[in-house]
Amino acid sequence: MKPRVLFVLHLPPPVHGASMVGKYIHDSEKVKEAFDAQFVNLTTASSLEDIGKGGWKKLWSFCEKLREIRKAIKTQRPDWVYVTPNSAGSPFYKDYVVVQLCKRWMKEKGRVMLHFHNKGVQTRQERWLDDKLYRRFFKDVKVILLGKPLYEDVKKYVEEKDVWYCANGIPDNGACPEEKVHEVPRILWLTNIMRTKGLMEYLDALRMLKERGVRFQADFVGGLTKEVTGDEFELALTVHGLNDCTSYVGKKYGPEKEAYFREANIFVLPSYTEAFPLTILEAMQWGVPVVASTVGGISAEVGDGETGFLIGGKVPIMDNMFRPDALELADKIETLLTDKELRVRMGKAGKLKFQQEFTLEAFEKRFVEILSQVSTNS
């Protein structure tokens, strides 16, 4: 008999990393073949802007989700409950309730598995209330993390024997990256226009490159946010003297987004904080070398000096205090801008690493193996 698993996860909309992985799990034939799977959508936000907000409507929706979970546990009697919780802040407090109730409703202890698509425990663990909650939250659970670097985030509360590692994957679109022949190399930023993504440091780095006489075209693809309005972004480009070597095209999806990866020579993500961004996997799929911060699990994606460059040191950074150094960022980008052979070599290495480790097929295989192993050993 197949193990019965209740998957309590986030599904789109809105579209973000965790919800996309949730959709991959929900739609996976391998998961359905291996397990008697039932699903509850934990999402209460209607848009990206709605994430983290409160209100009576969302409270009512949350209560409905709890009723749905309780009913599924009582009627389906799953062997395991799988939950994708948030790790810090007000979203964590909500998911704390979900996880603790799941533990209570399950007849046996140790039958809840937590799959984290984010990080942040280490940033809150010194607070008295959060520390008390984390100690209860992580008791009698199994944990899946996106990569070994992220164990640092939870090691205060979880023994590594109760942790499994499952890197995300994305569908292999069969992209055959061609050598990009541009008179002026193109740098791609593909994420929301936010300060916490390292926007201002990146603009500083681009200004340095321009002052050095290095030629480039920097494309910005992503939505505007409350952090940076359209007027503020336009002003920042003007102040940095970048209007003649940058373009902002807004959000792009599907083939339109792929067109920018196809033409990019370098992909940048100098974020203050990340977990395991799927956009880096997309860049690798298209054979684009990556320059990114050493935050969260990015070092498990990018081989420093092999498939791109990491900035911020060799040790993965878990706190939210990191700020990328604009000079270091400029130097790494310049190295790739001025060395075509290095760009091509790193791009090919990234494509190979993607095919070996980060396809959706590889993710599904790892995911099913982990859940099967946990079910067998428990």
Task: Describe each region flagged by the PLM.
Residues K251-K252, A259-A264:
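Short alpha-helical donor nucleotide-sugar binding micro-motif in glycosyltransferases
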Residues L6-F7, E178-L206, A218-L224:
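Conserved donor-binding/catalytic core segment of Leloir-type glycosyltransferases
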Residues E328, T335, L342-Q356:
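A short, well-ordered alpha-helix in the C-terminal region of glycosyltransferases
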Residues D231-K252:
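Nucleotide-activated donor-binding/catalytic signature segment of Leloir-type glycosyltransferases, i.e.
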Residues R135-A175:
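Donor nucleotide-sugar binding/catalytic pocket of nucleotide-sugar-dependent glycosyltransferases
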Residues Y272:
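Aromatic "clamp/platform" in nucleotide-sugar-dependent glycosyltransferases that forms part
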Residues N41-A45, L190, Q217-E232, G250-K251:
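Glycosyltransferase donor-sugar binding loop
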Residues P289-A292, V302:
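Short hydrophobic beta-strand element within catalytic cores of glycosyltransferases
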